[in-house]
Amino acid sequence: MPVMSPRSREETTPLPPLLPPPRTDRGRRRLPPLSAEDRDVLWLYLLTRASLWITAYGASWLFPADAGARDAGPVLAPFERWDWGHFLNVARDGYFPAGRGPWDAEWDNREAFFPGFPLALRAVHTVVPSWTAAGLLISFVAGGIAVLALVRIARLYLPDAHAGRRTAQLLLLSPCAVFLATGYSESLFLALALPAWLAAHRRAWPLAAVLAALATTVRVSGLFLAAALALHFVLTARTRSDWRPLPWLALPAAPAALYAWYLHARTGDWMAWKHAQERGWYRQFHAPWEAWSTTWESAFDQVLTTGYAFMFQAELLAMVVGLALVALLVHRRRWPEAVYVGLSLWALGTSYWYQSIPRATLLWWPLWITLAAWTLRSPRFRTAYVCLAAPLSTLFALTYLTGRWAG
């Protein structure tokens, strides 16, 4: 790996700053071999996957939907929850099977989900007969790629030799880590978005744009990544030759535009994706304070059952963490990272109520690098994180794996 550039005076203080400016590698384009740290991270990744599979097995036997059940059901059934059904329906039947669509009263609003993960699922299913196993395999492979990319990004930001391993550890033990092991789109998105960010810091702009475009096929968050990449490009371009890759930055918007065109051709609605979000998940625009108020009432005013109320409490906490992260990034002048996280918060924090913000934290790599810097500086902070995150990650995993709403 390239040697880190000399740090500025501010960075020579005993307390390393939050996300110091990353190094830029204009040299080699060939991927380096796996280091000892990479192998350690992959071992940790395998162990955390095994722990989640054990949890899933135990959940099906200890917490069945029917307390009198004598059969735990199919071994992969705990992973067939919630959004997985939408991805499966799109992959197996398409977006508008047999002429059905949003004009039907019982429509499931599946067009709210971008096509990247369902397309990958359909492709893998050609060689893996089980749809669920195919989805888990995608997330398993993508998650491994993602943690290796995260290790390399952490090395750019932090000088500590253990920075990459620590950052990956914090992500894999995070409260919502279960969603990296299920048939959801988070792992696949990270497997594309993190290498795109890494390529941008190496000024490999065509590669960064292609990877970001692929990430946009998976989640709308790819557009937030594209905005961060564009800002990073503007802030780092110095010479005329640096500006030549500028047209590539339009590429990540193409998948979203093509998807909107496809939906318009089938529904006559250019905003079909947004309207599906509104119908299925109450994502009509509301002022941020209105969304906070509604979420607070849902969490604490006893208007919902305790399980849903707890998850809304988690939504509020995740919003506070996100706002604090953006404030820190702005304070440290990490503008592209602040734009990426800020756009995510704006999209999730301006609907009727908060939904999926805890899950979105998985995609905020600046958060995990920031926490890694703090834990490397303070062993007590690391101990506190592990002790607090462990029960939360267990609760979220059990909640999801037993079929309850987990955000």
Which residue stretches match the model-derived regions?
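Membrane-interface alpha helices of multi-pass inner-membrane proteins
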Residues: 172, 179, 193-198, 206-233, ...
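Transmembrane-helix motifs of polytopic, lipid-linked glycan transferases
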Residues: 123, 137-158, 324-325
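Signature aromatic-anchored transmembrane alpha helix within multi-pass, membrane-resident enzymes
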Residues: 250-253, 377-407
